[in-house]
């Protein structure tokens, strides 16, 4: 899954990038409203973390434009504006959650997970497809109730496939889930991750849809 961090404080931006990358998210970063607008128009994000005090525009105005342009993905406001009126304004403009600075990193991570679950239509952090159980909160996978060790990118790929089990998933969407815009993945890197996943959960569980992407089988014997 890919996140967009819109924060002009470089030190905080780097801290958020490091913490969320360790959680298994691919992250893009923007320090201005202009940069954020350009990235929003070029990639699919599971969630946006938005600071309000940007150097070239107010974050609320930016969010208002996104909502008017029908950008419906979750937005978490992260700001030093901590008055009740500020929170009400942010939520009324279209934010899905509001967290004031200073904040506990563990709380931010929990809110990110909750917003992504809500957007995916599930309040339960555990999702089961046949003999595969995915725990989004703890980033753990069970196969026949036994733990399977995955890398962060493997977990991100499997998460997308499990959430869309039985349906085809375009390879470009999987690329966006695991790579930031400035990454330079090799042309077959996704295939390598898919190969490794097949070794861990069963080679027939993930089907290749030639010229399109992949599909996780559901409700059938592999």
UniProtKB/Swiss-Prot annotation:
Residues 2-116 form the Response regulatory domain. One of its GO terms (cellular component) is protein-DNA complex. GO terms for biological process: regulation of DNA-templated transcription. Residues 124-218 bind DNA. It is found in: Cytoplasm. This is Transcriptional regulatory protein PmrA. GO terms for molecular function: phosphorelay response regulator activity; transcription cis-regulatory region binding. Member of the two-component regulatory system PmrB/PmrA involved in regulation of virulence. Unphosphorylated PmrA represses extracellular enzyme genes. Phosphorylation of PmrA by PmrB relieves such repression, which leads to activation of extracellular enzyme genes. Phosphorylated PmrA seems to repress expression of the pmrCAB operon. The modification 4-aspartylphosphate is found at residue 51. Keywords: Cytoplasm, DNA-binding, Phosphoprotein, Repressor, Transcription, Transcription regulation, Two-component regulatory system, Virulence. Pfam families: Response_reg, Trans_reg_C.
């Amino acid at each position: 899954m890919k996140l967009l961090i819109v924060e002009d404080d470089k030190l905080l931006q780097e801290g958020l990038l490091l913490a969320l990358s360790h959680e298994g998210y691919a992250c893009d970063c923007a320090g201005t409203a202009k940069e954020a607008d350009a990235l929003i128009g070029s990639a699919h994000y599971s969630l946006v973390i938005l600071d309000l005090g940007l150097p070239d525009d107010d974050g609320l105005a930016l969010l208002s434009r996104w909502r008017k342009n029908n950008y419906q993905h979750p937005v978490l406001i992260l700001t030093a504006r901590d008055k009740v009126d500020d929170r009400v304004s942010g939520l009324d403009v279209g934010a899905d959650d509001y967290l004031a600075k200073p904040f506990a990193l563990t709380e931010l991570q929990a809110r990110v997970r909750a917003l992504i679950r809500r957007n995916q239509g599930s309040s339960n952090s555990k999702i089961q497809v046949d003999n595969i159980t995915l725990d989004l909160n703890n980033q753990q996978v069970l196969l026949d109730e036994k733990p399977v060790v995955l890398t962060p990118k493997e977990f991100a790929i499997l998460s997308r496939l499990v959430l869309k089990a039985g349906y085809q998933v375009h390879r470009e969407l999987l690329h966006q889930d695991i790579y930031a815009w400035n990454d330079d993945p090799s042309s077959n890197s996704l295939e390598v991750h898919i190969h490794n996943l097949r070794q861990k959960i069963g080679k027939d569980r993930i089907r290749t849809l030639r010229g399109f992407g992949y599909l996780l089988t559901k409700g059938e014997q592999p």
